[in-house]
Curated annotation (Swiss-Prot):
It comes from the Bacteria. InterPro entries: MeTrfase_TrmA_AS, NA-bd_OB-fold, SAM-dependent_MTases_sf, TRAM_dom, U5_MeTrfase_fam. Its EC number is 2.1.1.-. This is Uncharacterized RNA methyltransferase R00878.
Length: 415
């Protein structure tokens, strides 16, 4: 461990400031390009001791839990609250540009579709019972310490206003001091609380049920995928199609980002008559596309497939929708199968869709919409498609995780 004064050169891919030193790059959280800072340095990791000269792009963070001096610790939920909007938005867009450029791809990248405070309808908290209280919040940066939060400016008021209720229910379910996870989803009928990492005795189950029934605004509580209590069936609206997500199901974290993605995908699909939606989840795109086209939705999670299928069967005015459970990593749709479609949409996890893209490349499908939460794997997947003759017609970065280093992207291709 050593200390020294350095000048920050740029932002790294994780939102840390990066300083050039004789020993190599040093990564320092909570610093900005152009700043002169004093750091404690351990190998390539720098810890901010003091700010000698601040950047004009530095702003006051809106949350009291953010940064080295955060209340209850340094919350790991955000990394860039101290950056101006202009710097932050450029950083997000450049993540996509740089990833594409690393694969030799130089399409025009559109302006970032921005996120706003309070947009987040899904939040994953860590909790732990202590002798004095129930800690609920986010892990401290690079630590298992829980920063217990009293506010969260990125998260919807519907969740933040019920933090006390969530703590009450969590306290009723927690039986030890072991940490556990709560994913909270704000749905149209109330909060959907998905607990993981707990074991529940019968008395605790009854206590949890009583706690839920004594509160307003809670639609469902589940534990490890099994429903504990469901006063109201959780519901999400996909432009007029109502879906009830299974416990812990993947959903887009914000409704504005989801709407922006859907708008881009629908515009690209256009007048296609048969569309395949791969990694379809609970139907974010498939059920919207079904207003104008026949859709075959493919998803690896059985409960998500059933939720999508039920929604399609119980909504009037949709074209036929078929739903298939299939692990696309192990068994991608083959090129011959894909030839039946006019357009394909794919929205894989962070690992991307490399194997599937090799089949898409051989299929000759006229239009492809690629939705991604990882610019690096997106660039790899797009390079597979462009090598097969596809032309990138649009790239739009979308901010869904405000003040973080995560960015969504919709890329459209034609052949």
């Amino acid at each position: 461990m050593s200390t020294g004064t350095v000048t920050i050169d740029r932002l790294g891919a994780q939102g840390d400031g990066v300083a050039r030193t004789e020993a190599g790059p040093v990564f320092a959280p909570f610093t900005l390009p152009g700043e002169t800072v004093s750091l404690a340095v351990n190998k390539a990791n720098g810890t901010l001791i003091s700010l000698k000269e601040a950047s004009p792009e530095r702003v006051e963070p809106p949350c009291r839990h953010f940064g080295p001096d955060g209340v209850n610790g340094t919350c790991g939920g955000c990394t860039l609250q101290h950056a101006s909007d202009a710097l932050y938005h450029a950083f997000k867009r450049n993540l996509v540009i740089d990833a594409l450029r690393s694969k030799g791809l130089t399409p025009e990248v559109g302006a970032l579709i921005i996120a706003r405070p309070g947009d987040r309808r899904r939040a994953a908290f860590t909790a732990r019972r202590t002798e004095k209280e129930l800690l609920l919040g986010y892990n401290q940066m690079q630590s298992h310490h829980i920063v217990s939060i009293g506010e969260c400016p990125i998260t919807s008021p519907g969740i933040v206003s019920r933090l006390a209720t969530i703590r009450k229910i969590a306290a009723a379910m927690a039986s030890s001091a072991e940490p556990f996870r709560i994913t909270v989803l704000e749905t149209d009928t109330g909060l959907d609380l998905a607990f993981e990492g707990l074991k529940l005795s019968d008395p605790q189950r009854r206590s949890a049920v009583d706690a839920v029934l004594g509160e307003r605004g809670i639609a469902r509580v589940s534990l490890n995928g099994e429903i504990v209590v469901e006063p109201l069936k959780p519901a999400i609206d996909f432009d007029g199609v109502t879906v009830s997500p299974p416990p812990g199901a993947f959903t887009q974290a914000t409704r504005p980002a989801e709407d922006a993605m859907a708008k881009l995908v629908l515009a690209h699909v256009g007048k296609a008559k048969r569309v395949a939606d791969l990694f379809a989840g609970i139907g974010t795109f498939a059920l919207r596309i079904a207003r104008t086209a026949r859709v075959h939705a493919v998803e690896g999670d059985d409960r998500a497939v059933k939720a999508l299928d039920f929604a399609a069967r119980n909504t009037q005015g949709l074209k036929p929708v078929t739903a298939e459970k299939r692990d696309l990593f192990r068994r991608p749709m083959m090129a011959q199968e894909l030839k039946a479609f006019d357009a394909v949409v794919f929205d894989p996890p962070r690992a991307g869709a490399e194997t599937q893209c090799h089949e898409l490349a051989r299929s000759g499908v006229k239009k492809i919409a690629a939705v991604s939460c990882n610019p690096v794997t997106l660039a790899r997947d797009l390079s597979i498609l462009t090598a097969a003759g596809y032309r990138i017609t649009g790239v739009t970065p979308i901010d869904q995780f405000l003040w973080s280093a995560h960015v969504e992207t919709v890329a459209t291709l034609e052949k």
